[in-house]
């Protein structure tokens, strides 16, 4: 892909919605696969009372809409302003207590796990039915739209084409209940092909530092997969 085309795909613009300022992609098709669309606000005439505490709205008790769920609340039930990066808001926005809790948890993904995914890790990669794995660095692209694999060859898999993700684990010690991630089995569609393609990533057995990095990357990918499924189910 030429630098000009890549720049157009990654271009963003600042827009103002009823909920606040958002930095969104120039072209909607090039948005992050982890993103969420803004909700439709419940019309004012349909919510004469707070949808949490049932307080009646009047001149004193003002009505507020949660920017994440779109429901109506009084100030007491919708007072928190929390970052909502999945909707591309520039500043923290007003959210109800339940939504604020979810957004706080997601902030950890953007502050920690996303950085791990962008940095990448080294895996033994097997494509399809191949019996010979290839050592490759797997990372998430800067625009969050592709898994990029670099080794003797170069591959890119669009996150939008991913069908299923299975994290492969093994026990820490015999008989123990705790497990650790050692690999990932991923199925994705290929344009023009009827059957889904398969990719297996396995952490190498060489350097302990490399294994820890791979385990952290797999854990981050597990969290990313949950966000991906939520975005698709919206």
From Swiss-Prot:
A zinc finger (FYVE-type) spans 44-104. Disulfide bonds: none annotated. Widely expressed. Pfam families: FYVE, ZFYVE21_C. It is found in: Cell junction, Focal adhesion; Cytoplasmic vesicle; Endosome. Zn(2+) 1 binds at residues 50, 53, 74, 77. Zn(2+) 2 binds at residues 66, 69, 96, 99. The keyword tRNA-binding does not apply. GO terms for molecular function: zinc ion binding. Residues 107-234 are annotated as: PH-like. Keywords: Cell junction, Cytoplasmic vesicle, Endosome, Metal-binding, Zinc, Zinc-finger. GO terms for cellular component: endosome; focal adhesion. Signal peptide: none annotated. SUPFAM superfamilies: FYVE/PHD zinc finger. InterPro entries: FYVE-type_Zinc_Finger, ZFYVE21_C, ZFYVE21_C_sf, Znf_FYVE, Znf_FYVE-rel, Znf_FYVE_PHD, Znf_RING/FYVE/PHD. The keyword Metal-binding applies. Interacts with PTK2/FAK1. Plays a role in cell adhesion, and thereby in cell motility which requires repeated formation and disassembly of focal adhesions. Regulates microtubule-induced PTK2/FAK1 dephosphorylation, an event important for focal adhesion disassembly, as well as integrin beta-1/ITGB1 cell surface expression. The FYVE-type zinc finger mediates interaction with PTK2/FAK1, and also interaction with PI(3)P and association with endosomes. This is Zinc finger FYVE domain-containing protein 21. It comes from Mus musculus.
